[in-house]
Curated annotation (Swiss-Prot):
Annotated protein name in UniProt: Large ribosomal subunit protein mL50
GO cellular component: mitochondrial inner membrane; mitochondrial large ribosomal subunit
Gene this chain is encoded by: MRPL50
Localization in the cell: Mitochondrion
UniProt KW Nucleus keyword: no
Lineage: Eukaryota, Metazoa, Chordata, Craniata, Vertebrata
Membrane-crossing segments per the record: none
The organism of origin for this protein: Bos taurus (Bovine)
Primary location group: mitochondrion
Alphabetical list of Pfam families matching this protein: Ribosomal_L50
Residues forming coiled coils: none
Family under the similarity heading: Belongs to the mitochondrion-specific ribosomal protein mL50 family.
Length: 159
């Protein structure tokens, strides 16, 4: 360790010299020289225009006539051929079995269970109830246009 000694005492400052160098020179050796900051060029990405009317999220779904037999055959494929007679009461607690069962049904019927309803599918009966409900792809405005409106009320899309 270098010996410190006071080189001079003034009224406003105290100069300390370590190993023969003034304080400013001592600390300046430890500082790294600052490199000039180079600004990177950023390419401007043009965004696509926002659509005026977003596409409909759900597609039309009409349940087939043989829905129960299709469901029963998928239950036998996924859960094995030794399915009890009350196949609608089979529990869907096993996540892997539930996924494979619902994925096969979605491929077969062309209509998938949305994520917001997956937690409600606890038994095969819940899945059957979901797939028996038909889905229309029309909005409320389309239904209003198709309904019998009074002559003083008219809905136009091209405004």
């Amino acid at each position: 360790m270098a010996a410190l000694w006071v080189a001079g005492v003034g009224r406003k400052s105290l100069t300390v010299v370590a190993s023969g160098a003034p304080r400013r020179e001592f600390w300046s050796r430890l500082r790294k020289e600052k490199q000039p900051v180079v600004a990177e060029t950023v390419e401007e990405v043009k965004k696509e225009p926002i659509l005026v009317c977003p596409p409909l999220r759900s597609q039309a779904y009409i349940p087939p006539k043989d829905l129960q037999s299709r469901l029963e055959s998928h239950v036998k494929e996924v859960f094995g051929s030794s399915v009890p007679t009350s196949w609608q009461e089979i529990s869907l607690e096993d996540v892997h079995m539930k996924f494979s069962f619902l994925a096969r049904l979605a491929d077969d019927l062309g209509h998938a269970v949305p994520n917001s309803r997956l937690h409600q599918m606890c038994r095969v009966r819940d899945v059957l109830d979901f797939y028996t409900v038909p889905v229309q792809d029309r909005s409320k405005f389309d239904e209003l246009i198709a309904s019998n409106l009074p002559p003083n009320l008219k809905i136009t899309w091209g405004y």
